[in-house]
């Protein structure tokens, strides 16, 4: 008897899931904007490394060219 009840509950849950597919709750639809996941210091470090390596590469290519 318990197994039949479990199967019935699973069938109801599955059919409810099928009928509500595509319906998004209003709370998750109008979520506020999230902050950037990267902090300003980490962003500054990343820009420093990228620009510094580009400048270093330019200087190195000028030295090798002469």
From Swiss-Prot:
- GO cellular component terms attached to this protein's record: cytoplasmic microtubule; cytosol; endoplasmic reticulum; endoplasmic reticulum membrane; ribosome
Q: Which Pfam families does this UniProt record tie to the protein?
A: RAMP4
Give the membrane topology, semicolon-separated if more than one. Answer: Single-pass membrane protein
Positions of transmembrane segments: 39-59
Q: Which domain of life is it from?
A: Eukaryota
Question: Which compartments does it reside in?
Answer: Membrane; Endoplasmic reticulum membrane
Return the Polar residues bias intervals.
17-30
The GO annotation for biological process reads: endoplasmic reticulum unfolded protein response; glucose metabolic process; insulin secretion; muscle organ morphogenesis; plasma membrane organization; positive regulation of growth hormone secretion; positive regulation of insulin secretion; positive regulation of organ growth
Q: Which InterPro entries match?
A: ER_stress-assoc
Region Disordered: which residues?
A: 1-31
What is its quaternary makeup?
Interacts with SEC61B, SEC61A1 and the SEC61 complex. Interacts with CANX.
Concerning its family, UniProt says: Belongs to the RAMP4 family.
Please describe what this protein does.
Interacts with target proteins during their translocation into the lumen of the endoplasmic reticulum. Protects unfolded target proteins against degradation during ER stress. May facilitate glycosylation of target proteins after termination of ER stress. May modulate the use of N-glycosylation sites on target proteins.
Protein known as: Stress-associated endoplasmic reticulum protein 1
**Which organism does this sequence originate in?**
Homo sapiens (Human)
Gene that this sequence comes from: SERP1
């Amino acid at each position: 008897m318990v197994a039949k009840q479990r199967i019935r509950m699973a069938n109801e849950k599955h059919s409810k899931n099928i009928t509500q597919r595509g319906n998004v709750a209003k709370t998750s639809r109008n979520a506020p904007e999230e902050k950037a996941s990267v902090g300003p210091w980490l962003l500054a470090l990343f820009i420093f490394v990228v620009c510094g390596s580009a400048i270093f590469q330019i200087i190195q290519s000028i030295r090798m060219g002469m």
